[in-house]
A protein has these predicted regions:
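Gly/Ser/Thr-rich helix-start
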Residues: 117, 205, 232-233
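Ferredoxin-type iron-sulfur electron-transfer modules and their immediate structural context
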Residues: 1-197
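Conserved SAM/SAH-binding loop-helix junction
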Residues: 152, 209, 232
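Short acidic, glycine/serine/threonine-rich loops at helix termini
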Residues: 32-33, 212, 233-234
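Residue-level detector of alpha-helix initiation sites
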Residues: 138, 204-205, 229
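Glycine-rich FAD pyrophosphate-binding loop
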Residues: 219-232
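Short glycine-/small-residue-rich flexible loop motifs, especially phosphate/cofactor-binding loops
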Residues: 11, 211, 231
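N-terminal Rossmann-like FAD-binding beta1-loop-alpha1 element of flavoenzymes
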Residues: 197-222
Length: 234
C-alpha cells in the first residue's frame, strides 16, 4: 500500500526501520562499496546483532488477568477477567498499524476492521469502535470471548514472535462490554421492513447470528429453541 506521502506503507510503519526503496543506481553503489571493502581486507558480516537486540521497541503483551484456580474450582463462569480501561489502553498502544489491510484483518474469517477499532480504543472512542465491530460481526461480544484468536487474527499479528501479539480478542470483548454497559445498542433505525417471515430453529450462536443478519435486512424473524434460555452451548 502506498501512503499519501508517496512512500510505501510498509516502510513507514516498520518498527525497526529496516526497509528502504532502492533503485539501480543505489544498488550499484552498495555493490562497489562492498567490493572496495573486500579488496582492502575490511569485509564484514552483514549480520546485525545490535538490530535484533533492539527489535521492536514495543511493550510486551500482558493480556487479561486470569482468575486463580482456587476460585475457579467453585464455579463454571469465565476464567479471564475483562480488561479495564488502563489495560485496554496499554494493549491498543502496542498495535503498530502495520497496514490498512493488516495480517490480522485478512486472517479473521469475518475480516473485521481490527486495526481501525483498536485505533478507536486508543482514542477513547468506544461507541464508535462498537459500531465498527458490529458492521462485520453479529456477535462481537461473543467472538471476543470464544473465537480461537491464537490461530487466526492474533496468530497472524506482526508482533507475535517478538513482544507477543496484541490481545485482539480481549480488546473486542472490552469494546462491546463497555459500550453495552454505556447503553449502546445496534442502530436499526434505517432498517426497511419487508413482508417475508423466517423461523430460525435453534437459539445458539449460529441461529442468533442468522437471525441478526435477516433482521438487518428487514425480514421478520422468530427464533425457536427447546431450551428456556438462548445461547446454546454458550
Amino acid at each position: 500500500n502506498q501512503r499519501s506521502s508517496g512512500t510505501q506503507a510498509c516502510i513507514e510503519v516498520c518498527p525497526t526501520q529496516a526497509l528502504r526503496l532502492m533503485d539501480d543506481k543505489g544498488l550499484q553503489q552498495i555493490k562497489v562499496a562492498r567490493q572496495r571493502k573486500t579488496a582492502a581486507g575490511k569485509a564484514s558480516s552483514d549480520a546485525q546483532p545490535s538490530r535484533s537486540a533492539a527489535l521492536l521497541p514495543v511493550n510486551s503483551r500482558k493480556g487479561a488477568d486470569k482468575i486463580s484456580a482456587s476460585e475457579r474450582k467453585n464455579h463454571f463462569g469465565e476464567i479471564y477477567c475483562g480488561l479495564d480501561p488502563q489495560q485496554a489502553t496499554y494493549e491498543s498502544d502496542r498495535c503498530v498499524y502495520c497496514a490498512e489491510k493488516a495480517n490480522c484483518n485478512w486472517h479473521c474469517p469475518l475480516h473485521n476492521a481490527i486495526p481501525d477499532y483498536i485505533r478507536l480504543v486508543q482514542e477513547g472512542k468506544i461507541i464508535e469502535a462498537a459500531e465498527l465491530c458490529h458492521q462485520t460481526s453479529s456477535l462481537p461480544e461473543i467472538c471476543g470471548r470464544v473465537c480461537p484468536q491464537d490461530r487466526l487474527c492474533e496468530g497472524a499479528c506482526t508482533l507475535k514472535d517478538h513482544s507477543g501479539a496484541v490481545t485482539i480478542g480481549n480488546l473486542e470483548r472490552y469494546i462491546t462490554d463497555t459500550a453495552l454497559a454505556m447503553g449502546w445498542r445496534p442502530d436499526v433505525s434505517k432498517v426497511v421492513p419487508r413482508s417475508e417471515k423466517v423461523a430460525v430453529i435453534g437459539a445458539g450462536p449460529a441461529g442468533l447470528g442468522c437471525a441478526d443478519i435477516l433482521a438487518r435486512a428487514g425480514v421478520q424473524v422468530d427464533v425457536f429453541d427447546r431450551h428456556p434460555e438462548i445461547g446454546g452451548m454458550l
